[in-house]
Design a protein with these regions (language model features):
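Catalytic cores and adjacent flexible loops of soluble metabolic enzymes
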Residues: 1-311
Protein backbone atom coordinates (compact mmCIF):
# COMPACT_ATOMS: atom_id res chain seq x y z
CA UNK A 1 0.00 0.00 0.00
CA UNK A 2 1.31 3.42 -0.97
CA UNK A 3 1.55 6.27 1.50
CA UNK A 4 0.72 9.96 1.35
CA UNK A 5 2.44 11.56 4.33
CA UNK A 6 0.57 14.56 5.72
CA UNK A 7 2.84 15.56 8.61
CA UNK A 8 3.23 19.16 7.46
CA UNK A 9 -0.35 19.61 6.30
CA UNK A 10 -2.47 17.91 8.98
CA UNK A 11 0.22 18.31 11.61
CA UNK A 12 0.10 21.99 10.82
CA UNK A 13 -2.97 22.22 13.06
CA UNK A 14 -0.69 21.49 16.03
CA UNK A 15 1.83 24.25 15.22
CA UNK A 16 -0.51 26.86 13.74
CA UNK A 17 0.85 25.98 10.28
CA UNK A 18 4.13 27.65 11.18
CA UNK A 19 6.73 24.92 10.70
CA UNK A 20 10.37 26.10 10.90
CA UNK A 21 11.81 26.11 7.39
CA UNK A 22 14.91 24.21 8.53
CA UNK A 23 12.74 21.35 9.82
CA UNK A 24 10.48 21.37 6.75
CA UNK A 25 13.54 20.96 4.51
CA UNK A 26 14.92 18.13 6.67
CA UNK A 27 11.53 16.44 6.61
CA UNK A 28 11.21 16.75 2.85
CA UNK A 29 14.73 15.51 2.16
CA UNK A 30 14.47 12.54 4.53
CA UNK A 31 11.04 11.31 3.46
CA UNK A 32 11.71 11.84 -0.25
CA UNK A 33 14.28 9.05 -0.02
CA UNK A 34 11.65 6.53 1.14
CA UNK A 35 10.20 4.64 -1.83
CA UNK A 36 7.16 3.52 0.14
CA UNK A 37 5.94 7.13 0.24
CA UNK A 38 4.32 8.37 -2.96
CA UNK A 39 3.55 11.94 -1.93
CA UNK A 40 4.48 14.45 0.73
CA UNK A 41 1.59 16.79 1.46
CA UNK A 42 3.17 20.09 2.46
CA UNK A 43 0.07 22.08 3.43
CA UNK A 44 -2.95 23.96 2.17
CA UNK A 45 -2.72 26.01 -1.01
CA UNK A 46 -3.60 29.69 -0.95
CA UNK A 47 -6.07 29.56 1.94
CA UNK A 48 -6.31 32.32 4.51
CA UNK A 49 -9.51 31.79 6.49
CA UNK A 50 -7.96 29.92 9.43
CA UNK A 51 -4.33 31.04 9.44
CA UNK A 52 -2.00 33.58 7.87
CA UNK A 53 1.01 31.29 8.29
CA UNK A 54 3.05 29.68 5.52
CA UNK A 55 1.77 26.11 5.47
CA UNK A 56 -1.88 27.15 5.30
CA UNK A 57 -1.24 29.63 2.49
CA UNK A 58 1.24 27.88 0.19
CA UNK A 59 2.24 29.11 -3.24
CA UNK A 60 4.85 27.78 -5.64
CA UNK A 61 7.62 29.96 -4.26
CA UNK A 62 6.98 28.68 -0.72
CA UNK A 63 6.87 25.07 -1.94
CA UNK A 64 10.18 25.51 -3.77
CA UNK A 65 11.67 26.99 -0.62
CA UNK A 66 10.97 23.67 1.12
CA UNK A 67 11.89 21.35 -1.76
CA UNK A 68 14.83 23.54 -2.84
CA UNK A 69 13.70 22.93 -6.43
CA UNK A 70 14.45 19.22 -6.28
CA UNK A 71 12.22 18.46 -9.32
CA UNK A 72 11.04 15.23 -7.68
CA UNK A 73 7.35 15.83 -8.52
CA UNK A 74 6.31 14.26 -5.22
CA UNK A 75 4.53 17.17 -3.53
CA UNK A 76 0.82 17.09 -2.80
CA UNK A 77 -1.18 20.13 -1.72
CA UNK A 78 -4.60 20.21 -0.09
CA UNK A 79 -7.55 22.50 -0.69
CA UNK A 80 -10.85 22.57 1.16
CA UNK A 81 -13.61 23.42 -1.31
CA UNK A 82 -15.50 25.31 1.38
CA UNK A 83 -12.62 27.77 1.87
CA UNK A 84 -10.38 27.65 -1.21
CA UNK A 85 -10.24 29.88 -4.28
CA UNK A 86 -12.64 28.75 -6.99
CA UNK A 87 -10.54 30.30 -9.78
CA UNK A 88 -8.60 27.49 -11.47
CA UNK A 89 -5.96 29.96 -12.63
CA UNK A 90 -4.85 30.28 -8.98
CA UNK A 91 -3.49 26.71 -9.01
CA UNK A 92 -0.22 25.12 -10.20
CA UNK A 93 -0.14 23.30 -13.53
CA UNK A 94 2.13 20.67 -15.05
CA UNK A 95 4.47 23.44 -16.20
CA UNK A 96 6.35 23.00 -12.89
CA UNK A 97 7.98 19.83 -11.50
CA UNK A 98 7.49 20.02 -7.74
CA UNK A 99 3.74 19.55 -7.24
CA UNK A 100 2.12 16.55 -8.88
CA UNK A 101 -1.17 16.25 -6.99
CA UNK A 102 -3.90 18.51 -5.67
CA UNK A 103 -6.23 16.96 -3.11
CA UNK A 104 -9.60 18.58 -2.66
CA UNK A 105 -11.81 17.72 0.29
CA UNK A 106 -15.52 18.34 0.31
CA UNK A 107 -18.31 18.39 2.84
CA UNK A 108 -21.53 16.57 2.02
CA UNK A 109 -23.40 19.81 1.37
CA UNK A 110 -20.74 21.06 -1.08
CA UNK A 111 -20.25 17.94 -3.19
CA UNK A 112 -22.15 18.94 -6.33
CA UNK A 113 -20.32 22.25 -6.69
CA UNK A 114 -16.99 20.69 -5.67
CA UNK A 115 -17.26 18.03 -8.37
CA UNK A 116 -17.73 20.60 -11.12
CA UNK A 117 -14.85 22.66 -9.81
CA UNK A 118 -12.67 19.55 -9.57
CA UNK A 119 -13.36 18.71 -13.20
CA UNK A 120 -12.23 22.17 -14.28
CA UNK A 121 -9.22 21.98 -11.96
CA UNK A 122 -8.10 18.71 -13.56
CA UNK A 123 -8.55 20.12 -17.06
CA UNK A 124 -6.63 23.31 -16.28
CA UNK A 125 -3.75 21.88 -14.23
CA UNK A 126 -3.23 18.53 -15.98
CA UNK A 127 -1.81 17.05 -12.77
CA UNK A 128 -3.28 14.39 -10.48
CA UNK A 129 -6.38 15.43 -8.59
CA UNK A 130 -7.83 13.57 -5.61
CA UNK A 131 -11.38 13.95 -4.33
CA UNK A 132 -11.57 13.46 -0.56
CA UNK A 133 -14.95 12.71 0.99
CA UNK A 134 -14.96 14.36 4.42
CA UNK A 135 -16.77 13.02 7.49
CA UNK A 136 -17.21 9.62 5.88
CA UNK A 137 -18.33 7.89 9.07
CA UNK A 138 -21.57 9.89 9.05
CA UNK A 139 -22.63 8.52 5.64
CA UNK A 140 -24.98 5.55 5.51
CA UNK A 141 -24.16 2.69 3.14
CA UNK A 142 -26.84 3.94 0.76
CA UNK A 143 -25.46 7.49 0.86
CA UNK A 144 -21.95 6.19 0.16
CA UNK A 145 -23.10 4.26 -2.91
CA UNK A 146 -25.18 7.20 -4.14
CA UNK A 147 -22.20 9.52 -3.66
CA UNK A 148 -19.86 7.08 -5.41
CA UNK A 149 -22.13 6.92 -8.45
CA UNK A 150 -22.18 10.72 -8.53
CA UNK A 151 -18.39 11.09 -8.14
CA UNK A 152 -17.16 8.20 -10.30
CA UNK A 153 -17.73 9.81 -13.75
CA UNK A 154 -15.48 12.75 -12.87
CA UNK A 155 -11.80 12.66 -13.90
CA UNK A 156 -10.22 12.19 -10.46
CA UNK A 157 -7.16 10.01 -10.03
CA UNK A 158 -7.69 9.18 -6.36
CA UNK A 159 -10.78 8.94 -4.19
CA UNK A 160 -10.27 9.19 -0.45
CA UNK A 161 -12.61 8.56 2.45
CA UNK A 162 -11.68 10.67 5.49
CA UNK A 163 -12.36 9.27 8.96
CA UNK A 164 -12.55 12.89 10.03
CA UNK A 165 -13.92 12.21 13.51
CA UNK A 166 -11.76 9.15 14.23
CA UNK A 167 -14.78 6.99 15.03
CA UNK A 168 -14.55 4.30 12.35
CA UNK A 169 -13.81 0.70 13.31
CA UNK A 170 -13.15 -0.85 9.92
CA UNK A 171 -13.25 -4.39 11.34
CA UNK A 172 -17.00 -3.80 11.47
CA UNK A 173 -17.51 -0.72 9.31
CA UNK A 174 -15.56 -1.49 6.13
CA UNK A 175 -18.47 -3.51 4.74
CA UNK A 176 -20.45 -0.26 4.64
CA UNK A 177 -17.89 1.17 2.19
CA UNK A 178 -17.45 -1.85 -0.09
CA UNK A 179 -20.28 -0.99 -2.46
CA UNK A 180 -18.92 2.52 -2.98
CA UNK A 181 -15.35 1.23 -3.32
CA UNK A 182 -16.54 -1.20 -5.98
CA UNK A 183 -18.06 1.65 -7.98
CA UNK A 184 -14.77 3.56 -7.86
CA UNK A 185 -12.61 0.53 -8.63
CA UNK A 186 -14.70 -0.37 -11.67
CA UNK A 187 -14.02 3.14 -12.95
CA UNK A 188 -10.26 2.75 -12.54
CA UNK A 189 -9.92 5.04 -9.52
CA UNK A 190 -7.33 4.53 -6.80
CA UNK A 191 -9.03 4.37 -3.41
CA UNK A 192 -7.62 5.30 -0.02
CA UNK A 193 -8.49 6.28 3.54
CA UNK A 194 -7.35 9.09 5.83
CA UNK A 195 -7.36 7.55 9.31
CA UNK A 196 -7.61 9.61 12.48
CA UNK A 197 -6.71 8.05 15.82
CA UNK A 198 -9.17 9.72 18.18
CA UNK A 199 -10.44 6.34 19.41
CA UNK A 200 -7.11 4.51 19.15
CA UNK A 201 -8.12 2.44 16.13
CA UNK A 202 -5.93 3.88 13.37
CA UNK A 203 -3.56 0.89 13.30
CA UNK A 204 -6.43 -1.60 13.48
CA UNK A 205 -8.09 0.20 10.59
CA UNK A 206 -4.86 0.26 8.58
CA UNK A 207 -4.57 -3.52 8.89
CA UNK A 208 -8.10 -3.86 7.50
CA UNK A 209 -7.14 -1.68 4.52
CA UNK A 210 -4.13 -3.92 3.84
CA UNK A 211 -6.28 -7.06 4.03
CA UNK A 212 -8.72 -5.56 1.54
CA UNK A 213 -6.10 -4.34 -0.96
CA UNK A 214 -6.74 -0.62 -0.72
CA UNK A 215 -4.38 1.48 -2.81
CA UNK A 216 -3.28 4.20 -0.43
CA UNK A 217 -3.45 5.63 3.06
CA UNK A 218 -2.35 8.81 4.81
CA UNK A 219 0.18 8.90 7.63
CA UNK A 220 2.00 11.47 9.72
CA UNK A 221 5.11 11.31 11.84
CA UNK A 222 4.15 10.45 15.43
CA UNK A 223 0.54 10.95 14.35
CA UNK A 224 0.95 14.73 14.05
CA UNK A 225 -2.45 16.15 13.21
CA UNK A 226 -5.69 17.71 14.32
CA UNK A 227 -7.21 16.50 17.57
CA UNK A 228 -5.66 13.20 18.66
CA UNK A 229 -3.85 12.84 15.37
CA UNK A 230 -3.48 10.30 12.58
CA UNK A 231 -2.09 6.92 11.65
CA UNK A 232 1.59 7.00 12.65
CA UNK A 233 4.06 6.75 9.78
CA UNK A 234 6.66 4.97 11.90
CA UNK A 235 4.22 2.13 12.67
CA UNK A 236 3.54 1.23 9.03
CA UNK A 237 6.89 2.00 7.42
CA UNK A 238 9.18 -0.79 6.23
CA UNK A 239 11.73 -1.35 8.98
CA UNK A 240 14.65 -0.63 6.67
CA UNK A 241 13.66 3.05 6.71
CA UNK A 242 13.29 3.44 10.47
CA UNK A 243 16.85 4.57 11.19
CA UNK A 244 16.70 7.82 9.24
CA UNK A 245 13.14 8.54 10.34
CA UNK A 246 13.98 7.91 13.99
CA UNK A 247 16.90 10.34 13.78
CA UNK A 248 14.62 13.00 12.29
CA UNK A 249 12.20 12.46 15.17
CA UNK A 250 14.97 12.57 17.77
CA UNK A 251 16.32 15.82 16.35
CA UNK A 252 12.85 17.41 16.47
CA UNK A 253 11.14 15.57 19.31
CA UNK A 254 9.58 18.60 20.97
CA UNK A 255 8.22 19.92 17.67
CA UNK A 256 6.82 16.51 16.72
CA UNK A 257 4.61 16.05 19.77
CA UNK A 258 0.86 16.32 20.22
CA UNK A 259 -1.14 15.76 23.40
CA UNK A 260 -4.37 13.81 22.85
CA UNK A 261 -7.33 15.23 24.73
CA UNK A 262 -9.94 13.18 26.63
CA UNK A 263 -12.54 15.42 25.02
CA UNK A 264 -11.55 13.87 21.66
CA UNK A 265 -12.71 10.49 22.98
CA UNK A 266 -16.18 11.92 23.51
CA UNK A 267 -16.46 13.65 20.12
CA UNK A 268 -15.25 10.43 18.50
CA UNK A 269 -17.86 8.43 20.42
CA UNK A 270 -20.62 10.56 18.91
CA UNK A 271 -19.06 11.08 15.46
CA UNK A 272 -18.51 14.83 15.90
CA UNK A 273 -15.92 17.27 14.63
CA UNK A 274 -13.13 17.59 17.17
CA UNK A 275 -13.61 21.36 17.16
CA UNK A 276 -16.19 20.69 19.87
CA UNK A 277 -13.48 18.92 21.87
CA UNK A 278 -11.19 21.90 21.49
CA UNK A 279 -13.91 24.23 22.75
CA UNK A 280 -14.86 21.94 25.63
CA UNK A 281 -11.25 21.95 26.75
CA UNK A 282 -11.07 25.75 26.52
CA UNK A 283 -14.15 25.99 28.74
CA UNK A 284 -12.73 23.39 31.18
CA UNK A 285 -16.04 21.53 31.08
CA UNK A 286 -16.53 18.38 33.09
CA UNK A 287 -16.67 15.31 30.87
CA UNK A 288 -20.23 14.61 32.06
CA UNK A 289 -21.41 18.09 31.05
CA UNK A 290 -19.52 17.92 27.77
CA UNK A 291 -21.00 14.54 26.89
CA UNK A 292 -24.51 15.73 27.70
CA UNK A 293 -24.06 18.43 25.05
CA UNK A 294 -22.41 16.13 22.51
CA UNK A 295 -25.12 13.48 22.59
CA UNK A 296 -27.69 16.08 21.47
CA UNK A 297 -25.76 17.36 18.44
CA UNK A 298 -27.35 16.19 15.19
CA UNK A 299 -27.39 16.60 11.42
CA UNK A 300 -24.81 18.86 9.74
CA UNK A 301 -23.78 20.27 13.12
CA UNK A 302 -22.01 16.96 13.72
CA UNK A 303 -19.64 17.59 10.82
CA UNK A 304 -19.49 21.39 10.73
CA UNK A 305 -18.71 23.13 14.01
CA UNK A 306 -21.58 25.26 15.31
CA UNK A 307 -20.09 27.84 17.67
CA UNK A 308 -23.54 28.55 19.15
CA UNK A 309 -23.65 25.11 20.79
CA UNK A 310 -20.75 25.69 23.21
CA UNK A 311 -20.43 29.33 24.21
Amino acid sequence: MKIIDVTLRDGGHAVEFDWPLKFARQYYSTLSSINQIDYLELGYWGQKSKSANTFYDLDLEKVCSVTQKSNRSNVSIMIDYHYCSHEVSDYPTDSQSEISMIRMCSRKEDINEALEFGKELKRYTNINVSFNIFNASNYSEEELIETAKKVAPYPFDYIYFADTHGDLNLVHDLSRFKGAMGVFKSGGKKVGFHLHDHSGLAMVNYNELVKNNLDSTDTSIRGMGKGSGNLKLEYVLDKKYLGELSQLILNNEKLLTITPSPYDLITSKYGLTDNYAKRGKELAMSIADFENVCKRITSLDKDSYNKEILK
